[in-house]
Amino acid sequence: MVEPGQDLLLAALSESGISPNDLFDVDGGDAGLATPTPPSVQQQQPPSTTTFVLNQINQLPTLGSTIVMTKTPPATTNRQTITLTKFIQTTANTRPSVSAPAVRNAIPPAPAKDQVQLKDLLKNNSLNELMKLKPPANIAQPVATAAADVSNGAVKKESSNKEVARVWINDMKMRSFSPTMKVPVVREEDEPEEEDEEEMGHAETYAEYMPIKLKIGLRHPDAVVETSSLSSVTPPDVWYKTSISEETIDNGWLSALQLEAVTYAAQQHETFLPNGDRAGFLIGDGAGVGKGRTIAGIIYENYLLSRKRALWFSVSNDLKYDAERDLRDIGAKNILVHSLNKFKYGKISSKHNGSVKKGVIFATYSSLIGESQSGGKYKTRLKQLLHWCGDDFDGVIVFDECHKAKNLCPVGSSKPTKTGLAVLELQNKLPKARVVYASATGASEPRNMAYMNRLGIWGEGTPFREFSDFIQAVERRGVGAMEIVAMDMKLRGMYIARQLSFTGVTFKIEEVLLSQSYVKMYNKAVKLWVIARERFQQAADLIDAEQRMKKSMWGQFWSAHQRFFKYLCIASKVKRVVQLAREEIKNGKCVVIGLQSTGEARTLEALEEGGGELNDFVSTAKGVLQSLIEKHFPAPDRKKLYSLLGIDLTAPSNNSSPRDSAKKARKIGGLTGSSSDDSGSESDVSDNEESDYESSKNMSSGDDDDFNPFRDDNSSLITSQDAVERAQQMKKDLLDKLEKLAEDLPPNTLDELIDELGGPENVAEMTGRKGRVVSNDDGSISYESRSELDVPVEILNITEKQRFMDGDKNIAIISEAASSGISLQADRRAKNQRRRVHMTLELPWSADRAIQQFGRTHRSNQVTAPEYVFLISELAGEQRFASIVAKRLESLGALTHGDRRATESRDLSRFNFDNKYGRNALEIVMKSIVNLDSPMVSPPPDYPGEFFKDVRQGLIGVGLINVEDRSGILTLDKDYNNIGKFLNRILGMEVHQQNALFQYFADTLTAVVQNAKKNGRYDMGILDLGSGDEKVRKSDVKKFLTPGYSTSGHVELYTISVERGMSWDEATKIWAELTGPDDGFYLSLQIRNNKKTAILVKEVNPKKKLFLIYRPNTGKQLKLEIYADLKKKYKKVVSDDALVHWLDQYNSSADTCTHAYWRGNCKKASLGLVCEIGLRCRTYYVLCGSVLSVWTKVEGVLASVSGTNVKMQIVRLRTEDGQRIVGLIIPANCVSPLVNLLSTSDQSQQLAVQQKQLWQQHHPQSITNLSNV
């Protein structure tokens, strides 16, 4: 019988990477190591230690062997830890009984002399003597050491082959110990675990979508899919009857699935939340499904029920035309759309605003915070809208693309933005309004949901009191948790999310090789930036700049750094894009090129400098660095300095006031900042700019007199003349160096593309910029405005779009900023029906963003699906981004060209790296580079030179490692484990260095993920059972009522048994059909416990020699094996030879785990714990239904029984009778406490029933409607 406390220790130990079993019995191997004669210090290794954070120690259970606790002396390290050291008794007598362990604060039974010596030496901190000291003889080889850092509480694993002194001085961190490389050794008993690594597969992630409960309307013109987890829950019954005209439905102006969304939204709007607000609805449809029409349908439905006023918020004013088109298309011609920004301040219904009494007011999020300077009663847009709606307003408010209304409610120290507060205030002031949120990434990013307070997920009457409670619960639980929230919302009828299937779409990855000259130029640029960084630092120190100024300066510096290298990356691809585009046009297709940013600001600056004259295309990259040096280099002008020194204090200094520079930053950041931000490079840039601007605004809002960046400690205003001179000189030198480099820097990508592809008359440009640089017939270069005689700038993009859709121009270039919501597909209604080829030069590194981008050319009602071309260079990580995006496209149904990605699918593409494993891997990488930690993997073998040394220099150059001035000690940047920052910054390293570093990061990530899998801590998102050949049966189901504010209200606990083995009969059936020369039965070369492994092998990819493997106990394996690996471990045999071994393992795996089968005993079983590794038949307990309503209860049980770290694993099942179940796996030891909790909360069940009855009294139409339906 296991004592209650032992669970805790086992959890803690396995968390630390120590196999709990090692504490209990002695493996033959281990015992052999504990020889009585002490070998020399060099060979002997320290005892295995697990360091617990202090507060865990009082919960330590009683253990059979001696436990020694040594308190760490505060002098040596700042971590409060206690080290638990494992000693294995090598005496002949048996173990002491488990009930009475010896726990003592002493050193183990080593010779007394040693003990004294060690104590004294520790007291005197005598390091040399300590190093000579031999460890006690009876200490076994370590398993691993783990140390919990107080700073972040996460347990990190360190390899245990550090010098012996480490343990004797209690894990003191010493710089001088060079980390020795640890080559992972495969122990023989690891092997059978491997086959169990992913016993649950990920099946296809999307399923074909059809409305289930609603049978009206025509089919959607294109195939639509939904994630499988959502498709396995059914929405509530429909009792609402829409008022939309038969004509609209019969003509298919609203398709069946758009009508479904309209109906559920209207039905949800009939219910109220516990706090009295009307419930809202979230449309999570992806790009191209027709969100616009669905919204128009909801507005129309309410208009017909005489709710004639509606508000529609979106990201750009251009989309107003789309809104009008959508309303017109569904037959709601009489509903007018008014732009909020065209109204004068004052009553909207007044005469001077055209007496607007009804219709839709269309506004952008930014216009919501508009304010008039002149005063008056309705001087803000918000007041205008509130007055127009009236207090009892029960019409529709639509928040379209609501994820774009950034930082509506940032969590943490930053304040919510004005826009965010306005959106919340609008909802709070109009509690009866019918709110609709629309966002394709609606429920994938929980933080984006902050302002969706009408969904009733948090607040009064829900498990989460505040939004922050909800966020904490969800983010702690990883990917799976968000899926549960989404499923729960669909169950309750408040969420719907479909995506256009990518069937028919093809994509290819074009690798652009970098020429020698380009790499040379790139490396030169890197060197210049490294020098610039040093000069900025030196100059700031010279003139003794203030902290605030430095912060602003570095914000600008890194923002420019990132943009500079982004531009260089993109420029390397221009030639290839031009070639490809010309080819595609020849083949009768048309081309769409996606860019993230336009570089307009640089062009304007160059123009200003040249007095309106240009003699060549402007180099955006050069402009970035030049403007940085000119505006933000800390070298004050002489004249300005004098004015600062008191001659005229009122003139603020251009170069020295961060307020100015922040304003400037805003100005130039207008285009470049925002576009680099949109590109998915969640960089340190945009955030810093924002925060620097805020902070500098706050600090300089006082009197200008008391703000001076050059004040020294004595508050005197004197800056040494000499220092200023030197700073000026540095600035001049930098600009000279830049001029030298500028000869090689590439020109503005957008202008070059347009020029190469035949000029503005052939290329439709849809971007946010106002002018462009063109080359004239005589070869001269000039700047011209984009606007044309008959077309105002506002609708220029729409005109250009029309020209493209009419076939006047066959090439379109779109920038991120201008493109949201624009449709460029080969529409059946458009003249230009050529197949679209969509090329992207810059992939965002989140797949969601990429899909959003591709939604421009892949939409409903198209004649042909587009082709995507990703252009990637060999710079750090671009291939990786491409494969992540490709992976997502494949799961949505797209096809690759040819078979070239078959190799990559075995590659790393399945790991998205912006997650906790990525951050963990990055932490290990960074720490190993500065010798704070030992590397998990060896550096890339083909790197010429000293990898760690070179990379260290490189990272110092890009500011991710800082050097302390006086001591020369290396420290890591505060955000050193921020993936986005890392990926952006390493672009500023020389080409071969960044590639090697990225490779090293990727290898480390693979190792981290493998470790997590081994320790059973890997969060795989949603897993599938019954997707392969397993047989899934329901053996029991318990139902529980749960309180809920609407019709939902129960959870079920299923007991599921899964049989996954393969009998000999089944195996021989497959074997009979095999044809390949290497197919057939194999036996393992290694014999363990007098047994061999039998497997059945089938070749699935002859070109790559990839084989599928079947095992007797676990059936078909997900992981394909390469032939070379197979040959190392197995030899081919005839079926008769395999028979005995196959049957033996098949029969024993019914109730014997792999360990017991191969070793004769299982450590876990000997403790009385259940071990299921390698079993043929497994039992799972799955909780489904409205899990969100009992979330806190489930959390409570899981935490109390299994410790806080148990992960929430979601599973998808398909039972033998075809039923689909999605839910949470409840660990076996949590089942009975959970059942008790759910069933004893009888009151809440009664309450739930009462709430339901009460609800039905309040909504009689639901009952009458039900009888009508």
Curated annotation (Swiss-Prot):
It comes from the Eukaryota. One of its GO terms (biological process) is positive regulation of canonical Wnt signaling pathway. The modification Phosphoserine is found at residues 126, 178, 656-657, 661, 700-701, 1262. The modification N6-acetyllysine is found at residues 113, 377, 1098. Residues 21-47, 652-725 are annotated as: Disordered. GO terms for molecular function: chromatin DNA binding; histone binding. One of its GO terms (cellular component) is nucleus. It is found in: Nucleus. Residues 679-693 have a biased composition (Acidic residues). Plays a crucial role in the regulation of neural stem cells (NSCs) proliferation. Enhances the phosphorylation of GSK3B through the PI3K-Akt signaling pathway, thereby upregulating the Wnt/beta-catenin signaling pathway and promoting the proliferation of NSCs. Improves ischemic stroke recovery while inhibiting neuroinflammation through small extracellular vesicles (sEVs)-mediated mechanism. Enhances the secretion of sEVs from NSCs, which in turn inhibit both the MAPK and NF-kappaB pathways in microglia. Belongs to the SBNO family. PANTHER family: PROTEIN STRAWBERRY NOTCH HOMOLOG 1, STRAWBERRY NOTCH-RELATED. This is Protein strawberry notch homolog 1. The lineage of its organism: Eukaryota, Metazoa, Chordata, Craniata, Vertebrata.
